[in-house]
Amino acid sequence: MSLELKIEGMAELQAALRKASAEAQEAVGVAVIGTAMELRGDIVKRIQGGPASGAVYTRGGVSHQASAPGEAPASDTGRLAGSITFDKTGPMSATVGSDLVYAAALEFGSGRIDPRPAWVPAIEKITPKYIARLEKALGSSFK
């Protein structure tokens, strides 16, 4: 599963990147990579440590309290949190994702389960910081 972060004014940003110095382009790369790493960490933290006020059930003699609808998924086996990956895909690009099919079902809901969002709230939280990092990296060429 992966979500894309769309930036309004992308054409202007791309034009600024083409004009930017090598140092500014490197700084943008650092901003992108740092933000992606931080985003991954926040998603994992939400899954591992978020509130769990849903149903309690026992499986294999071990009891687990699930998350309630609207809460981040409550970690059970650790498989979901462990599946969250960060990859640098280029000098100024990165992805954060999960290869688990049920990651999307938990985030957005499915026919059997209400949404348990962790990704969207994490993206919403980090977006202002990401924009500030890009502005700082590009300096006056971004304005």
Label each region the model flagged:
Residues 1-143:
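Short, Lys/Arg-rich flexible segments
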